[in-house]
């Protein structure tokens, strides 16, 4: 990758996903837009409700209702052709602001063994953190989030989640123990554990080592993607990347590294 480390966050914040959205009641009238990979679909709901003049609260891709995840992570999970064709309809409403801040608190706890850094922040600063995501404003986000990453405490673990898409029962998928479990189309499971940023001999923990520790059957080698690889922000993640550096440069705005398994 030719992008320098210092510009990786800016590049990620600038990345967009083009969308082609229709309402179930008006399939021939699309709403065309592009949204940041770090944004959330629910932020479009007021505009969509006004555009379609109909209640809008849930998003569907090929009849699968999408979860309340960052757009970039959803794109990694479903690997759609672009523009991504979605259908919006009425359904369960999302409270993404509270969900986002709760995820930030959880990431803070994982990093240091407590959530003191985020809990000590003022209401004004936590509001600014969320507003920076709404506005896709990396500069404003960095001013607040840097305080969480450069806390006067020992960094213990990297907030890390591994998403494993399930193989539909009729897809003829691999039935070996290393393959993702069969399930409904579009479903997935999440593997999450406390992953130290340092090895027992005080060397930086690498992504491949963490994957092998978490799922040795699926990742028998810590050096090479023998049976499976993982995607982060639309590209294959290198197994030799230090987790601590990845956390600082390539985590989602809520502080989590979110990898999607590709078999």
Task: Map each language-model feature to its residues.
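Ubiquitin system architectures
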Residues: 1-34, 41-263
């Amino acid at each position: 990758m030719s992008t320098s480390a210092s510009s990786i966050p800016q590049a990620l914040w600038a990345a967009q996903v083009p969308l082609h959205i229709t309402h179930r009641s008006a399939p021939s009238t699309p709403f065309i837009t592009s949204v940041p990979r770090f944004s959330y679909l629910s932020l479009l709901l007021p505009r969509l409700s006004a555009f379609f003049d109909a209640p809008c609260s849930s998003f569907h891709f090929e009849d699968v209702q999408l979860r309340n995840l960052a757009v970039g992570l959803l794109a990694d999970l479903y690997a759609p052709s672009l523009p991504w064709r979605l259908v919006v309809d009425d359904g369960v409403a999302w409270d993404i602001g509270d969900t986002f801040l709760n995820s930030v608190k959880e990431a803070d706890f994982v990093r240091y063994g407590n959530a003191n850094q985020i809990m000590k922040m003022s209401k004004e600063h936590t509001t600014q953190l969320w507003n920076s995501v709404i506005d896709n404003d990396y500069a404003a986000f960095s001013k607040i989030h840097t305080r969480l990453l450069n806390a006067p405490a020992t960094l213990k673990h990297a907030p890390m989640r591994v998403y494993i898409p399930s193989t539909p029962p009729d897809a003829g998928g691999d039935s070996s123990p290393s393959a993702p479990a069969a399930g409904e189309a579009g479903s997935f499971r999440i593997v999450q554990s406390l992953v130290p940023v340092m090895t027992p001999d005080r060397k930086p923990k690498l992504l491949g080592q963490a994957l092998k520790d978490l799922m040795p059957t699926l990742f028998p080698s810590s050096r090479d993607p023998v049976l499976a690889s993982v995607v982060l922000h639309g590209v294959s993640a290198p197994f030799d990347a230090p987790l601590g550096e990845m956390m600082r440069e390539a985590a989602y705005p809520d502080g989590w590294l979110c990898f999607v398994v590709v078999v």
